[in-house]
């Protein structure tokens, strides 16, 4: 798993993959990685690399996984 994403990685598919990989990490690092994913999602939306609907869907996935 990548420890960080670069600007050209901030797409819907790459962010979704980052979230999926974060969930499969150990329980101690998962919340930190999901927090990073939320930040990356916000940055991608602000930079108009993903749409509002995509950002909302990714944020919803993050919230669901954080509740696990």
Predicted regions and their residues:
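Acidic, Ser/Pro/Thr-rich low-complexity regulatory regions
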Residues: 1-68
């Amino acid at each position: 798993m990548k420890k960080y994403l670069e600007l050209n990685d901030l797409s819907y598919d790459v962010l979704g993959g980052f979230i999926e990989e974060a969930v499969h990490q150990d329980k101690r690092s998962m919340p930190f990685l999901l927090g990073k994913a939320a930040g990356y999602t916000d940055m991608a939306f602000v930079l108009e690399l993903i749409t509002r609907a995509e950002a909302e869907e990714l944020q919803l996935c993050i919230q669901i996984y954080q509740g696990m």
